[in-house]
């Protein structure tokens, strides 16, 4: 794949979320959609992409081996593979697989098929989304120019989106999938009353992938995680809760973020109604 595209692009595919708003005991990324799991749709797009060269798949800590077997071993997706475990207890990190091999050293998956990844691994997710992304960035042990961070709960990713994002991140260093807001948005005060109304023409709904130069996003996450670790981060009421990667880069580096219009079909599966909408899009 690296011969098709001069840039080395690592995709971090996030699949560790709990999905409490789905009102189901099953994680939304593993629910069925059109004959596949929700996660499988975006995994397949990344695997078959002429742009993405490498993959880090971030899974629930208790399901890393299952995800490894289902999405990597079964797809023959890695020539050189590692399983890294971040943020686990000592007992968990010393766990063994069925053959008695330490999971923290598990590797293999020789002989990648054409159209798969040059390098791939599974890592355990963290307490919050940004912790999971940081674990994913820390797992990159190969040459990397750009990082594409994508929610596994967004199944309708396309190669065209990836192409537009690559062009933008190569030019600007930071680019995120987005679409212009269709709705008028209100800013609320603490009591639930309207405080202000931003100009709708300037309001965008943010999606994923969110794409950055590797060195930029690595520096940004190391800064934010370092502040939390050493207790130097601003108090909770002084900064908003981090909900996406662009916020991390904005806060830590001030680097401008380019918005890339990827349309309205790139929805996130959050509620049962979203599954129905995605089914309709897949039917065409």
Regions found by a protein language model. Name each.
Residues 3, 204-284:
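Conserved alpha/beta core of the MobA/IspD/sugar-nucleotide pyrophosphorylase nucleotidyltransferase superfamily
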Residues 187-212:
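Short, flexible, basic/aromatic active-site loop/helix in glycosyltransferases
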Residues 117-188, 207:
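Conserved beta-loop-beta/alpha segment of the NTase-like Rossmann-fold superfamily
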Residues 13, 39, 136, 151, ...:
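Residue-level signal for inorganic ion chemistry
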Residues 3-67:
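N-terminal glycine-rich phosphate-binding loop and ensuing alpha1 helix
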Residues 33, 186-189, 269-270:
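Short beta-strand-to-turn element immediately C-terminal to the catalytic PLP-Schiff-base lysine
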């Amino acid at each position: 794949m690296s011969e098709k595209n001069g840039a080395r692009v690592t995709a971090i595919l996030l699949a560790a979320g709990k999905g409490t708003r789905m009102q189901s005991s099953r994680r939304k990324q593993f629910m069925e959609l059109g004959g596949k799991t929700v996660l499988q749709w975006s995994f397949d797009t990344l695997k078959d992409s002429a742009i993405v060269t490498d993959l880090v798949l971030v899974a629930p800590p208790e399901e890393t081996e299952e995800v490894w077997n289902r999405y990597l071993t079964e797809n023959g997706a890695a020539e050189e593979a590692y399983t890294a475990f971040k943020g686990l207890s000592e007992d968990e990190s010393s766990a063994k697989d069925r053959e008695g091999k330490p999971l923290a050293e598990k590797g293999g998956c020789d002989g990648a098929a054409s159209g798969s990844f040059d390098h791939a691994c599974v890592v355990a997710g963290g307490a919050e989304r940004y912790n999971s992304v940081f674990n994913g960035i820390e797992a990159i042990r190969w040459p990397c120019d750009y990082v594409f961070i994508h929610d596994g709960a967004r199944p309708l990713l396309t190669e065209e989106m990836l192409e537009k994002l690559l062009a933008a991140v190569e030019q600007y260093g930071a680019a995120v999938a987005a679409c212009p807001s269709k709705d008028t948005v209100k800013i609320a005060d603490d009591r639930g009353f309207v405080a202000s109304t931003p100009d709708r023409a300037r309001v965008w709904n943010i999606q994923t992938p969110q794409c950055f130069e590797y060195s930029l996003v690595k520096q940004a996450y190391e800064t934010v995680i370092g502040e939390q670790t050493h207790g130097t981060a601003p108090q909770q009421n002084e900064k908003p809760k981090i909900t996406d990667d662009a916020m991390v880069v904005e806060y830590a580096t001030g680097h401008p973020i380019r918005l890339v219009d990827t349309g309205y079909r790139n929805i996130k599966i959050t509620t049962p109604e979203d599954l129905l909408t995605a089914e309709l899009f897949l039917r065409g």
